[in-house]
């Protein structure tokens, strides 16, 4: 399912960023660019809305109904492999899930694992600027189970960490995308950032490592893309080591997760992971017809 109109310029940005070795750089062309003051107001509004229990509860229920509708539409296109690796995991204090980020709706892939297999609630860490989105996607960003992240050190050490702790202590699952930026339908795993693993170490929760393979079909989606299907691969569970610092833990877990995802990519697509650009790196794109 394609959201957001033409992706031609986005794909050009992906190609250029690969050439420049800027593998975590933003590629979307219409993302909000906000000042620190505007972001602070967004976050204040988000938390004030959550405090209005009745009004927020109604909108939260509507957001969940919307998600349920999309889940029914997408369910047949999502296959889950490796869930047996989670059979003995202790989720009493929750867990963090990491995966590759390639579509505004790829959270539905993780949601299927969390809700149908683990029987847990999913919370999603989103960038603060996502709260400024308009339309139905903006509504979902503001009223689903989300935890906005910001570049503010004070916010990260205070509000964000405490909200993350509260959600995890309730036994919920939190999705964090360690690649940070979304690259539309990009197949490859990109370098990971340390935040997800740092918080896993500080809060002493496991990290569930995942990788989604994107499969092409011959079914037309729009004028630029064919439809795609998805294979979510559960790669393993990473645990913090209580004998080393959170920083050392985060580096070790990041490296282990990257190696798992790299191997998963290479096994899924039968090719070595190399950061060059090829047309086949963008799933479903109809290069020869555009």
At which residue positions do the language-model features occur?
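Membrane-anchoring hydrophobic helices of lipid-metabolizing enzymes
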Residues: 1-96, 101-111, 143, 286-290
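Structural alpha-helical scaffold elements that stabilize or flank donor/cofactor-binding regions
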Residues: 89, 140-141, 167, 199
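A conditional alpha-helix N-cap/helix-loop micro-motif detector
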Residues: 76-79, 153-158, 189-190
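Structural motif corresponding to alpha-helix initiation and N-cap regions
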Residues: 80-83, 134, 158-161
């Amino acid at each position: 399912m394609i959201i957001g109109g033409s992706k031609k310029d986005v794909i050009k940005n992906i190609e250029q960023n690969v050439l420049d070795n800027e593998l975590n750089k933003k590629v979307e062309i219409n993302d909000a660019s906000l000042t620190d003051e505007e972001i602070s107001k967004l976050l204040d509004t988000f938390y004030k809305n959550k405090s209005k229990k009745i009004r927020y509860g109604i909108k939260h229920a509507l957001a969940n109904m919307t998600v349920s509708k999309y889940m029914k539409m997408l369910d047949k296109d999502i296959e889950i492999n490796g869930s047996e690796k989670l059979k003995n995991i202790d989720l009493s204090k929750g867990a963090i899930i990491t995966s590759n980020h390639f579509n505004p709706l790829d959270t539905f892939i993780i949601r299927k694992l969390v809700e149908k297999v683990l029987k847990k609630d999913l919370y999603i860490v989103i960038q603060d600027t996502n709260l400024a989105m308009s339309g139905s996607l903006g509504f979902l960003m503001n009223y689903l189970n989300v935890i906005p992240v910001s570049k503010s050190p004070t916010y990260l050490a205070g509000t964000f960490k405490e909200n993350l702790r509260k959600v995890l202590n309730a036994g919920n699952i939190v999705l964090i995308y360690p690649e940070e930026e979304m690259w539309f339908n990009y197949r490859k795993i990109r370098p990971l950032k340390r935040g997800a693993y740092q918080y896993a170490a500080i809060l002493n929760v496991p990290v569930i490592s995942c990788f989604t393979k994107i499969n092409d079909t011959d079914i037309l989606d729009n004028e630029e893309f064919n439809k795609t299907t998805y294979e979510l691969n559960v790669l393993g569970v990473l645990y913090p080591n209580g004998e080393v610092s959170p920083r050392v833990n985060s580096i070790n877990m990041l490296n282990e997760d990257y190696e798992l995802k790299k191997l998963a990519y290479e096994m899924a697509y039968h090719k070595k992971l190399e950061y060059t650009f090829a047309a086949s790196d963008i799933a479903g794109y109809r290069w020869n017809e555009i």
